[in-house]
Amino acid sequence: EENRLYDMMEAQTARQIAMLQERLTELKKTDDPARAERLLGQIIVIGTYIKRRNNLIFVGVQRGSISVQELRLCLNESAENLCLYGAECSALIKGDGQLSIEQATAVYALFEAVVEAELESLRSLLVSIEVGEALHMNLCISGDAPLRHLKDPFPALEWEEDEDGLQYVMLRVEKSGGK
């Protein structure tokens, strides 16, 4: 059971582990202090995601569901590290109760997909989640990378961009099974 859990964690964070290794390799090679600082910030942001995502998996397997509070802790820690990285970031999560492992990890995976896509250019990110009969996730992003491609891995996602270049990503996840 323990091996299965570790295999699941490794499989679900393999891309981020590879990103982390790439940045560590680049960090060892760079002589530019500004680039080194930027890489260290990215390493912290990606490392936080790996730690928190694995924690969601562990808690979910142990308890059969994940509390909204646990998801809140994940997003708050990631937001704090994005602020340290230099991007304005805030996460507001309203509601409580339980979510299925799939619901919680889908929300956190979308958050990470946005962060990864915008990592070099992210200026600000506002995350708003409301948990009721369904889970509604809204993100407002100021960055240079277009995010419309996120509809591929997240088919239920809605994406808009306003005249000022702000991007809005919305996702509704039914709250079945984890109530």
Q: Where on the chain are the PLM-derived regions?
A:
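Glycine-rich phosphate-binding loop
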Residues: T13, P146-P155
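Conserved ATP-binding N-box helix of the HATPase_c
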Residues: Q16, R23, L27, S100-S128
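Flexible, glycine-/charge-rich segments associated with ATP-binding catalytic modules
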Residues: D32, R38, K151-K179
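Short beta-strand/loop element within the Bergerat-fold HATPase_c
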Residues: L126-H136, C140
